Amino acid sequence: MSGGDGRGHNTGAHSTSGNINGGPTGLGVGGGASDGSGWSSENNPWGGGSGSGIHWGGGSGHGNGGGNGNSGGGSGTGGNLSAVAAPVAFGFPALSTPGAGGLAVSISAGALSAAIADIMAALKGPFKFGLWGVALYGVLPSQIAKDDPNMMSKIVTSLPADDITESPVSSLPLDKATVNVNVRVVDDVKDERQNISVVSGVPMSVPVVDAKPTERPGVFTASIPGAPVLNISVNNSTPEVQTLSPGVTNNTDKDVRPAGFTQGGNTRDAVIRFPKDSGHNAVYVSVSDVLSPDQVKQRQDEENRRQQEWDATHPVEAAERNYERARAELNQANEDVARNQERQAKAVQVYNSRKSELDAANKTLADAIAEIKQFNRFAHDPMAGGHRMWQMAGLKAQRAQTDVNNKQAAFDAAAKEKSDADAALSAAQERRKQKENKEKDAKDKLDKESKRNKPGKATGKGKPVGDKWLDDAGKDSGAPIPDRIADKLRDKEFKNFDDFRKKFWEEVSKDPDLSKQFKGSNKTNIQKGKAPFARKKDQVGGRERFELHHDKPISQDGGVYDMNNIRVTTPKRHIDIHRGK
């Protein structure tokens, strides 16, 4: 894995405020859709703006940026509801197609479903590495998309505002522009599919907008920055049936995982505050664009690119993040096994009980049949005293047979449940075994990557270099460590790899033949133990300086301080190496 170059431009892995390589906070996933990442419609190669390409990332501040307490939509008079209002229950995404007057939604402000409440509780953390989330729903654009992207349905999700804000919305000043929230509902991409996810883990804020009454009783308008005008009606009851819209599917795998670098890129959200005399509590509303398959692929490519770049310069943090995720998955697998063990134990108990009941019923039937045989000689002699006994025995047998049939059906159902429970437990145990192996591999990799943060002694001889030493930094595996620098550093102890990096550039600055290859600020940089700047064409985003790369990854037992294993690369070449180019 990469040794990176310094830490000054790569810090923030454990911070919720520092930017990384021009990316979002922490892991590149903090701060929401508009996190100062520098990725916006202006520098997005696929265009931007609502309904015209992809516009993930970018903007300023958290959430949607902007917005103010008086930014409720429209003139407060029309309330055009020519489109059928999409019913929106708390926590359930609904499709709404823009009409001439914007999006029409009818929010059912009843109780939040237990499933959504449990997920929000699970996301209270604490979490490392910035923003984490749970993908609740998947989006199937082929069932939603329209020919005109401006008329494509939006996915609208709502939550009770007071459930996600740090302070009651009713207590906010009327001119309050934003409010801090604990969770947001955003879109993200994974495995080339767009998802609607709940995210949490870093400080976030969203605009507060005021809903304005219209001429239609009970209908309000509100404008979320960057989204179509909302025409909202609210009722305080929960729909009897909470079903997903066509094209939106429930994700059965609800693992808590790091949110993506482009999470929230096609989502605009806000807290909507209603007039006091309306009797309605404030609601949080999230509006996400439905991406076409091509747009999803483009965004997934961008997500993968940014993930690779981050991993290349943060190998220890990446390994720790993967270990934390593997451990969380193992914990969930253990819980799954425990649930299935409980189910299987109950199934066995019921199975044994039903079997005992069936055995008893069969014995009763057998006794009745034996009694029939005992009086069978009187069957054809109605005048005989035993004939009545024969009839009674037959009636007993008939009733016993009915009971056996019922007990057999109950036993069969119990046997099926036991079989299903056995299979479910076996599958859960197999999944746990896979998660155990994954957790072990992640722990091993973390232990190896963490070696760069531990003391070590420099080894290796390096290689002879000429007066154009760093010309090779942008080629193949990079430029070698000069042999005369290796002679200076060999057998010396270093606190960590950052310490080695600093001493390496200091020694380069002391070498007359090598130092004369640097001019101006770069000469000053290496004298201070800082990496020199690469040429503009070899820089990528916030990565501007030459970097040290381990030819054999540390995760594969490559020597951390083995100077035969260390190369000097440009940022651009370093990224390409880790992409396998």
Swiss-Prot record:
One of the GO biological process terms: defense response to bacterium
A matching Pfam family: Col-Pyo_DNase
Region (Disordered) residue spans: 1-74, 242-269, 293-320, 421-488, 513-566
Domain of life: Bacteria
Comp. bias regions, Low complexity: 36-45
Skewed-composition ranges (Polar residues): 242-251, 518-527
UniProt key word Protein biosynthesis: no
GO terms under cellular component: extrachromosomal circular DNA
InterPro entries: Cloacin_colicin (IPR024575), Colicin/pyocin_DNase_dom_sf (IPR037146), Colicin_R_dom (IPR024566), His-Me_finger_sf (IPR044925), HNH_nuc (IPR003615), Pyosin/cloacin_T_dom (IPR016128), Pyosin/cloacin_T_dom_sf (IPR036302)
Biological role stated in the UniProt entry: This plasmid-coded bactericidal protein is an endonuclease active on both single- and double-stranded DNA but with undefined specificity. Colicins are polypeptide toxins produced by and active against E.coli and closely related bacteria.
Protein family per UniProt: Belongs to the colicin/pyosin nuclease family.
UniProt name for this protein: Colicin-E2
